[in-house]
Swiss-Prot record:
The protein's name: Short cationic peptide-4a
Swiss-Prot/TrEMBL GO biological process terms: defense response to bacterium
Keyword Secreted (UniProt): yes
InterPro entries: Cupiennin (IPR035164)
Amino acid sequence: FLAKKVGKQLASHLAKKQLE
Protein backbone atom coordinates (compact mmCIF):
# COMPACT_ATOMS: atom_id res chain seq x y z
CA PHE A 1 0.00 0.00 0.00
CA LEU A 2 1.07 3.62 -0.58
CA ALA A 3 0.54 4.68 3.03
CA LYS A 4 4.29 4.64 3.66
CA LYS A 5 5.04 6.76 0.60
CA VAL A 6 2.25 9.24 1.39
CA GLY A 7 3.37 9.38 5.02
CA LYS A 8 6.90 10.23 3.93
CA GLN A 9 5.67 13.00 1.62
CA LEU A 10 3.39 14.36 4.34
CA ALA A 11 6.21 14.37 6.89
CA SER A 12 8.46 16.13 4.40
CA HIS A 13 5.74 18.68 3.67
CA LEU A 14 5.17 19.36 7.37
CA ALA A 15 8.92 19.69 7.94
CA LYS A 16 9.12 22.28 5.16
CA LYS A 17 6.21 24.20 6.71
CA GLN A 18 7.95 24.24 10.09
CA LEU A 19 11.16 25.58 8.53
CA GLU A 20 9.38 28.68 7.20
